[in-house]
């Protein structure tokens, strides 16, 4: 049996090329792990036995490409990334019977490289949440403690990787939805620069904020997957025509003389003391490895939460207008009802409470008489946050701090307090507002739960993020630690 805890893309690829294992055998193992873990972590909405085995057999028939490290590798895909012929729900009742007729650009790219999609992972409904508890398909559990949340909204992707169920998963990040689950589950999660990866085929939440990114157990694996999904896409005008480097090149150069800034605001009141302690020790390790560390300030980051929930909710209220029960998805049709009745019933019954809350908030912020007071002001705050980062990066290469304000919290403990739930994204949201790349890696543990170290880079400088992360990962060897589960 393949132990994904002790494998990486390089070792799996070697076994496939050397025919120690076939793509079909590897796929069967991933499918079995996915199904056996469901009762405990509920990481998947859909597990595609038939499609995955058919795909693996096709790859075996052609043969593993020795020059392509992703050939025959099982992947899990967050359920807001459309997959042709495979149900895609965004974890919502309103889409619980939706089967796309096309693949997202990232799926096209990965399919060309020979991956095998095992299934679609659980998430907060329409990616709106920080705990993977708002899903129509039930809650997902944390890999390290099944009474804790896995983070959100990409909780299914993170928990499946951290539990050794799957080697690689894709997530999406609008305000921290890759990095927060990565932190809570002790794995590697990257939000790329806005415009690095195509959003075509990603069910939109906040169009100026959303980005697709990889979740993996190691930094080098993460770098390989990012390279595979990056690049200009004519179907997504927000992608930028940037060359896609080999992100693994230079990853082992170390961090000597790297200029690191540590924002004082990221260690302010309200950040869990255990988290602070673990992250400060990680930053001290960088100094011992030769990096130059000093304190910096991001003075407007404290306004990020307020600005984000106006801007993101406003974009969501527009993006979610298309779900009306007419052409696809759930419909509350009844004989004799008016069109307005159909819209009201479909959306009232099809959307969950958190999604309806954000639609209402966004519609209010965009309404006549309130636009200047809310949306325009939030957009101005966003500009100030962009400028804060730009100023710091004039004299620094990387910014380090905690990914989250606390370790994973109890399932159900914050469902009745939306503001408390929103505050969990305090340290991740500023990056989305600024369009910057950011990664979470495991920095250590507090009370037996993982703590994330957030590594923030300049626009389109994911290479320096990977180099920075790799140095700590290899020194700490924390990637060798894993939960006491065996699916």
Swiss-Prot record:
Instruction: Report the domain of life of the source organism.
Output: Bacteria
**What is known about what this protein does?**
Allows the formation of correctly charged Gln-tRNA(Gln) through the transamidation of misacylated Glu-tRNA(Gln) in organisms which lack glutaminyl-tRNA synthetase. The reaction takes place in the presence of glutamine and ATP through an activated gamma-phospho-Glu-tRNA(Gln).
UniProt source species = Oenococcus oeni (strain ATCC BAA-331 / PSU-1)
Question: Per the record's keyword annotation, is Protein biosynthesis included, yes or no?
Answer: yes
Q: How does it assemble?
A: Heterotrimer of A, B and C subunits.
Q: What is this protein called?
A: Glutamyl-tRNA(Gln) amidotransferase subunit A
Per the record, the similarity remark reads:
Belongs to the amidase family. GatA subfamily.
Catalysis: reaction(s): L-glutamyl-tRNA(Gln) + L-glutamine + ATP + H2O = L-glutaminyl-tRNA(Gln) + L-glutamate + ADP + phosphate + H(+)
